[in-house]
Design a protein with these regions (language model features):
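Carbohydrate-interacting regions of secretory-pathway proteins
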Residues: 15-199
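Short, small-residue-biased leader/transition segments that mark boundaries at the very start
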Residues: 1-11
């Protein structure tokens, strides 16, 4: 029996070692290493937090990862200091200030945070139920989790599942992660603890 027990333990440990998670911090808390700024809006580090703020041009702006990410779980915290529209893009590419890909909405309560919007394409693919409008807390830190695997996307805000969607076009998407400043001005959002686990 001791031989069988040893074999079981060996198989168990080899299985757990193979499943070792590869989690990467996307933001080092000091500078924008690993990111690319698109547009003229403001991206900077303050108090070890990543801040996006509308500039005088009041145009779209993006901060995108240098690396592409295919299947992953992204976790982050965001705090909205002003009204305004932001978002987290996945499997996306940016050319100038035109983005191709999919956005997980980050907006004030009542404006579909956690929903999926396809820019320059089909528009809204899915919005959370209106009963979830009050999940986002303005002026406070909110937890967001985004899981992208194959053609399926699930989003959570403050541990509440916001949406789940299966979409063949998303399944074919290739690109990185990007944070957005919407046009129109008046936007200021803080971000921290951006961590991505490759699946």
């Amino acid at each position: 029996s001791s031989a069988a027990s040893y074999l079981y333990k060996r198989q168990f440990f080899s299985c757990t070692q193979n499943q070792k998670v590869d989690t990467v911090s996307l933001f080092n808390g000091n500078n924008l290493d690993g990111w690319i700024i698109y547009g003229t809006e403001k991206w900077y580090v303050d108090n070890n937090e990543l801040v996006c703020e509308s500039g005088p041009d009041k145009q779209y702006g993006y901060l995108g990862t240098q690396d592409n990410f295919d299947d992953f779980i992204l976790q982050l915290k965001f705090k909205q200091e002003n009204n305004g529209n932001s978002g987290v893009f996945f499997r996306s590419t940016v050319d100038g200030t035109k983005v191709k890909g999919w956005q997980v909405e980050v907006a004030p309560p009542g404006f579909h945070s956690g929903g999926i919007y396809e820019s320059y394409g089909r528009g809204w693919l899915v919005k959370p139920q209106s009963s979830k409008d009050s999940i986002v807390k303005m002026g406070e830190w909110n937890d967001m989790k985004i899981k992208v695997k194959g053609d399926e996307v699930t989003t959570w805000i403050n541990d509440t599942e916001m949406i789940k969607i299966k979409d063949s076009i998303i399944g074919k998407g290739i690109g990185g992660v990007a944070l957005q400043i919407h046009d129109g001005g008046g936007i200021k959002v803080r971000w921290k603890d951006l961590k991505i686990q490759k699946l």
